[in-house]
Amino acid sequence: MEPNYYVENITVMNADGDFSGRMKPSAFLRYMEQAAMDHARAFGMDDKFFREHGVSLLVGKQALKFERVPFRGEKLTLTTRAERCRRGSIKRITTVTDADGVQIATADCRWIMVSLAEVHILRQPPWTVEGFWNDSVEEELPLRLHKCKEDLIRAGEWTANYSLCDLNGHINNAFYLDIACDALPLDVVRKGPVTFSSINYHREVPLGEKMEVFYSPSEQGWYLIGKHNGQTSFECYLEFSAGETDRQR
């Protein structure tokens, strides 16, 4: 384990369970992002801090992997650690252990820091915080998307409604996974939970605007792409477990 890390304990909320009682992959991303924000706040980097420094943190891409998908009501421990900014990207790894101390999930998130005044990516933050960063974080997940350019199937159109948007006024990063699962044929998601996901965020979809979503089988899973005003908004690759069809009683 790297020397600088932050630990947060959670209970999987009922509202974050799917039809089988398992935690939705989008919920994992929300819990992970909350732990990252709490980590920063514990070192004095709150909303006011970022406003005063004229910067914003955005997620560029992220991946998650489940060894076992937890059920609603389970008590979990999230351990998150961040690597020093390299070429404008901050790697943050979050691991999840269950009540028995077994690691059941990992998330690899790549954050970017943007100057609000000049609207460009900063290669290094204009401050230092002792005890927050690690020189390196060894663990990582594959971030490949296994893109498909042909034979894409149109799933439909999604509106960035109130329930999908966050304080920034556009679709929340985690909810793109819900959209991706909604876009796929129901038989696919019924067969088993998501065990791996890689997602890239290209352009935001503002509140009230629409996005077309397309999908295609790819490698061992499914490739999805969302387009807003003719430009790519997000791309995603999902893999599902085959056979974990039992429900939590």
Describe each model-derived feature in a short phrase.
Residues 1-59, 106, 114-195:
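Hot-dog-fold acyl-thioester-processing enzymes
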Residues 3-8, 63-146, 205-207, 216-249:
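HotDog/MaoC-like acyl-thioester-processing domains
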Residues 47-48, 55, 73-76, 92-94, ...:
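Short, positively charged
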Residues 74-75, 150-154, 209-210:
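Short coil-to-beta-strand transition motifs
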Residues 158-238, 246:
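Acidic/His-leaning functional-site neighborhoods
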